Amino acid sequence: MGTAIHNNEDITIPQKNDGIKGVGIYHKGCLDGTAAAAVLLKKFPDVLLRPLSHRYKEEDLNNIVEETDNEAIVYIVDFSLREGHSEKLIEKVKEVVNIDHHIGSEEKLKILDKNYSNFSFVFNNERSGASLTWTYFFGEKDIPQLVKYIEDSDIWRFTYGDDTRYAVSYLYQFSGHPEKMLDYVNASEEEIEKILMDGKMIKEYRDGQRDVLLRDVSPINLKIKEHVVPVHNTPEFLRSDVGHVLATQLGKTVATFVINGDTVKLHFRGNDEHDPSALELAKILNGGGHRNAAAASVTLGEFFEMVEK
């Protein structure tokens, strides 16, 4: 953990009615990032939320910087900016708090914390972004069950077994919509039961789609340095479903990929016994994540160069 103080009355509340604009930057296209943003909304109903993906363009960040002033407090949750980019905000706004759990971010955050008095951070690779954000503002005691399910899936533990799978299958439809996710943050036990029932049906349908993809689409091999990695063309919403089944079937770390314009997003998945790990492969391509679930992006040209001939 960095120098940020959580669950403390000294936290400045960045609401419009006290003249301070609060800005929240969160991980785009990610269920955990969306839940972290929903937690921000719960704490600060007037916060200005701005999503960024790991492939963000510098102009996207510049637009956010333009929206701030020297009284703004910026919370970056389940995400960290690229090297040299955080300074754009830190040097303009009143305060920046960065809450993240992606392994490639820790050293950058430590350096920023050392160099800037108005920057603080929370980092823990064993937790998820939403869980860390909740703990920062509200403490460990009353973490909502749905946040626990999201964390359980995001760091690929599945302590709650199928309940985790059912919950995230249902909640995935709200990814990218923190204002809708907020409705579920403090769901009652009865509401959670209904979510799990509906999520079970969705999960069964997803499993069928996964099986069709694995049956009808064969992986190709990528050469990543000295490693030959099977990669499967899989829609984003099924990346973990397909990735982990394929990794288990092939007995090695694999990746799924999607092509978006000139960018190819690779999601690496593996198991504890696999070497190299998902994280090690992602880091070769300047990506990051967790040991068994990590991601990186390459250009379309770089991707074709890596395809094993």
Give the label of every model feature segment:
Residues 161-219:
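Active-site-proximal loop/helix segment associated with metal-binding centers of metalloenzymes
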